[in-house]
């Protein structure tokens, strides 16, 4: 019965394995679209990796450059448009679980422009908590934009970068 199984011709010497390199903790990488599902891809491309929205300023004629009234955002956008921009930014924040950074040029939203930067989150519970807390506080669109003091809100919820 020894002819049933072929005998190995020669035992190959086993090669020694190289020791593994010790893993070092590297900085977390931003999400890549190749590993994402289609739904997530759409959300990321829709909100983009870093989205900036700036409330447009009116063009100022040379004759009235000295007048600050022409610089007022409220002369250029009505309340509904302001609420729309605000709603979009909150939605983008919610879609990408990011951080929203407000940069008002004046002391509050009633003065000057407001730049909103949305950044995708690094995996962190603290960041998610901040986002959800911010979102819960600011989803009420009945509150006019000018009544919300964004500069103080951002310091409380986001901390210093």
Curated annotation (Swiss-Prot):
Transmembrane intervals: none
Keyword Transcription regulation: no
Region spans: Disordered: 1-52
Record GO terms (molecular function): RNA binding
Main location: virion
Low complexity bias (residue ranges): 1-16
Keywords, ordered alphabetically: Ribonucleoprotein, RNA-binding, Viral nucleoprotein, Virion
Cell compartments where the protein resides: Virion
Keyword Ion transport attached: no
GO cellular component terms listed in the entry, alphabetical order: ribonucleoprotein complex; viral nucleocapsid
Biased composition (Basic and acidic residues): 36-45
Bias (Basic residues) ranges: 17-26
Summary of the function given for this chain in its UniProt record: Major structural component of virions that associates with genomic RNA.
Family (UniProt): Belongs to the torovirinae nucleoprotein family.
Name of the protein described by the UniProt record: Nucleoprotein
Protein's organism: White bream virus (isolate Blicca bjoerkna L./Germany/DF24/00) (WBV)
Name of the encoding gene: N
